[in-house]
Swiss-Prot record:
A GO BP annotation: protoporphyrinogen IX biosynthetic process
Function: Catalyzes the decarboxylation of four acetate groups of uroporphyrinogen-III to yield coproporphyrinogen-III.
Pathway field: Porphyrin-containing compound metabolism; protoporphyrin-IX biosynthesis; coproporphyrinogen-III from 5-aminolevulinate: step 4/4
Organism field: Parasynechococcus marenigrum (strain WH8102)
Record: residues binding substrate: R26, Q27, A28, G29, R30, F45, D76, Y153, S208, H323
Signal peptide (from-to): none
NCBIfam families (UniProt xref): hemE
Protein name: Uroporphyrinogen decarboxylase
One annotated Gene Ontology cellular component of this protein: cytoplasm
One function term, GO molecular function aspect: uroporphyrinogen decarboxylase activity
């Protein structure tokens, strides 16, 4: 147990820490003027996320501004797709667009195994530079999309409100979908191993759209592939803390705990205390302040952080939002979130 390691890494491993570490999902992004200025200069999202100099600069922007306890790679969950033979783009205000949606077994059979060091060397370069730059002041986080969510994008071809296309595949051609999900699980595990070998100290898997599944369908189409990713990564990197996030996860919290992850990232629609009562004690939590609260006053932000941390006291907890910070959030309120999070123990007393 070494206090020379970053606070977030120590907390994620379950060590006793003086306060909960704090970072924000999407902490590098449109709410920051410095990011918007750079976006105006480089309007292509793929260029910003795949040019190592730009990705590194953007990843470091919130660290320079707020000194969070975690610095996460600026990238996208779809970044590994071209390495498997699936082209995509991200259109401003429209979101991801898949050039040729996956709808047939021939397309699935044609997918390539992912070799991250060949198809995404820029990711490894950025993670290594981040690790060197932040030292022990912050933990470096890597991330991926989970198989179900990646499949939802590549089958639908874009973001969806009701996921009718992939659900039709799930219920009419389940063998096709299972083969696609299995391919993604193998590839995503390889990608996470590459991220860890390159410098990521903690990793998070986003299954953003698994909350659209019934509990029974979560057990069939999401959880087994989440678990496969976790199992494969833990075979080679057993000491790297693994976080799982699902938007709208209140109905499947107990199921998430069976996937082998170390920490469950909660959205804001479940009470922190109630969530902890439903989860085994060895499972840590991350979250879960409503990102909409950051449109409020600094006092309101502080009060909600205090309530969240007070309810999580005595458990492994990483303070975060329950979703990514929203575009248009006042930048000074992002600063207030970090400031209040770092000073929470001064207001509520000891964390342990």
């Amino acid at each position: 147990m070494s206090d020379t390691l970053p606070l977030l890494l120590r907390a994620a491993r379950g060590e006793a820490v003086e306060r909960p570490p704090v970072w924000m999902m999407r902490q590098a992004g449109r709410y920051m003027k410095i990011y918007r200025d750079l976006r105006d200069k480089y309007p292509s999202f793929r260029e910003r996320s795949e040019n190592p100099d730009l990705s590194y600069e953007i990843s470091m922007q919130p660290f320079h501004a707020f000194k969070p306890d975690g610095v996460i790679l600026f990238s996208d969950i779809l970044t590994p797709l071209p390495g498997m033979g699936i082209d995509f783009d991200i259109i401003e205000s429209k979101g991801p667009q898949i050039g040729d949606p996956i709808r047939s077994m021939d397309q699935v059979n044609a997918l390539r195994p992912l070799n991250p060091s060949e198809s995404m060397p820029f990711v490894g370069e950025v993670l290594g530079r981040l690790r060197e730059s932040v030292g022990n002041e912050a933990a470096v986080l890597g991330f991926v999309g989970a198989p179900w969510t990646l499949a939802a994008y590549v089958v639908e071809g874009k973001s969806s409100k009701n996921y009718a296309v992939i659900k039709a595949m799930a219920f009419r051609e389940p063998e096709l979908l299972h083969k696609l999900l299995d391919h993604f699980a193998e590839s995503i595990a390889n990608y996470l191993r590459f991220q860890i070998d390159s410098g990521a100290q903690v990793v998070q898997m986003f299954d953003s759209w698994a909350g659209q599944l019934s509990p029974a369908d979560y057990d069939t189409f999401a959880a087994p592939y989440q678990k496969k990713v976790v199992d494969l990564v833990k075979q080679t990197h057993p000491d790297t803390p693994f976080i799982l996030y699902i938007s709208g996860s209140a109905g499947v919290l107990e199921r998430m705990a069976t996937t082998g992850v170390d920490i469950i990232s909660l959205d804001w629609t479940v009470d922190m205390g109630e969530a902890l009562a439903r989860l085994p004690e060895h499972i840590g939590v991350q979250g879960n302040v409503d990102p909409g609260l950051l449109f409020g006053t600094p006092d309101a932000i502080e009060a909600r952080i205090d309530d969240c941390v007070r309810k999580a006291r005595g458990r492994k907890h990483i303070l975060n939002l329950g979703h990514g910070i929203l575009p248009g959030t006042p930048e000074e309120n992002g600063a207030a979130f970090f400031r209040s999070g770092k000073s929470v123990i001064d207001r509520i007393g000891a964390f342990a």
